[in-house]
Amino acid sequence: MRITHPAANFFSVAMGKQSHQNFPSVPSAPRSAASEPAYRTLREYTPFAHWKLLLGGVLAFHLLMALLRFDAKVSIGGDDSWYIIAALDFWNGVAFPSWHGAFYSILISPFVAAFGIHVPILKIFSILFSLSAIALLGIAIRRYLPPTVWIFSLLLTAAAPEMVSLAGSTYSEPLFMLLQACIIFLFLPLCNLTAPILSRRSIAYLLSLGLALFLLALTRNVGYGATIALVIFLLSIRRDWRKALALLASFFIFFTSFAIYKRLKWGVTDASFSGQLSKMMLVDFYDPAGDKETFWGLCVRVWQNAQQYLAFHLPGFLGIKMNAPSVILLSILIAAGIAIIFSKRTRSAFTWFLATYLIVMLGATFLTQQVQWNQFRLVIVYLPLLLAFFLYGLHSALSKVSPSMGNIGVTVLCGLSLLFTTSANVRLIDPLNLSKNLRGDQFAGLTPDWDSYLHVCQWAGEHLPDSATIACRKPNNARIYANRPFLGVFRYISDDPDSTWAYFNGQRVDYLILAHLRANPQQRTERFINSLHFNAFRLLEKKPDCLELLYYQGSSEPAYLFRINRENLQQSDPERYRRALEAGLIIYPDNFDALHKLALFALQQQRRPNDAVMYADRAIAFANRDKKSIPYPILEVKAMAIYLLGDPHQAATIFEQLAEADPNNPSHVYNLALCLQNENPTRAHQLFAKAKRLTQQNQ
């Protein structure tokens, strides 16, 4: 069904009419418009002139922004590094890339094998994927939207700073968007196809669509939702169960064939998302032994994710920066979506298709993703469809006031958004760092925390044996820079030091990298990613000399490489023992046990009582800061040091406090007597006798 809409005038007046014959024909629906309800019909708008020129302009703009903002480094997120590493492992026969989605890693594996880990080349492929996605989607939906809505849906997507950033990345989202566009390009003509279901043309459409759906699911696990969405649409809106069953059959042909390949070649017997589905139910993704989400907990998760993605990130894509997610905005979007679906003016098969697809895909995303992950790339892949849906509703509502008001209103609002996003892109252009990156400087443009961390990782790759196990928090990024594997430790293991040691011993960890990676990558605050630091605390509580500093980088936000020591250094190498205690204080500065041992070492091994007092005072300061009682060994060693410095009176004052707190401790009584033997010989003699008596009683 083709209609002439007031929106067509916006372009036809400016550029003239274009003959219908200039567009590829789409077969009419099996039923006539008279017998089929309007909302089940894929309405087509009168074609407008020069659409290819406009689409080319959008693509040129997106390419220009992507090139100007090109970043030759991998991102600090880590997932994009995983795809590259997985591609290398897949090509070398090490492992099948089954965690984040396999297709992107499989697709780039020949290029990684040919060129090595050459990030700029891989990012050029992502730019091509992004451009192709916008182009193919534009071709696929141009018949079903008013021209103004069509062009701005594509243009605002191309201009979104996050989209430009993603286009020049090694994440799988650009490929996902290309496959998504391919699905829409194939599915919409299939809906109106009149040929028999077993005809050559129908089978070609169905097999192509089944392959695209399978590859989408293989790219990101949420892609399985696309098949569900299309089947729901065919059954509920189109009432075409034959095509629905045929589409499912086509999908499972490819799914089953690939499952057989995985089992025979790689020994993989489960679907790639099975592990994620089990972890989806966890309250804390990084605590497998923790609580499972309840039904109400999942509902809360969906609502919170909807808030942060639709009422925070979505406005940000359009240049509207929010301080926090807006419940009011989310409520408006939900109400507007319902109105668009059910309003007679906007209700059509195409709007129902968009609604069905977006509800299923966004719903699956909001249900499966932990709230704290909060990654914009999870929803930006749906940005052009969201824009098409809501701009169409806005255009129709304004056109009800005046035939030209829809075009004017959409143009003004989208023009302002385009101004904001383009300005944001221009501000993010950094030609100096790009030039350095392309000349081989992998670190140019990194924030100090990441610069320190990756320099340490690179040093470890160059100086440590390949057989060593190095634990760190961001292993994928580390491997890209060091060209060697790392062990990722992402969670806090236990409050029990023995359990933490058991984990590190079980993993045979030889070295540990600790860095101050910012919790907020854009701003340095006191908060940093510290789960691995807390694990180090537990190691140090059990053995204060377990960390030996090998290398560090950075001053304001440093990173450290430690060797994990399991030897008895106190007996075998006293000086190395002292250095290890000092190294532990870098990470755990208020470790009373380490400070006490260092104070004793200064007294007994170095004969440096001033250093002993310094360590004791540091421990006392930490105790006062935290409003804790001062451990008596700290006071004892301080008093001993003060005595050796020639101040028995002050030392006696401290030992007096200790003896009063624990009158049956012969050591305190003896030391007090020792301090008083010149100042008060009589009392000192009595205390020596008491200390001797207490010692005999305790034997």
Feature locations, PLM:
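Extracytoplasmic catalytic/substrate-binding loops of multi-pass membrane glycan-assembly enzymes
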Residues: D71-I84, A95-P110, I117-P120, G267-S274, ...
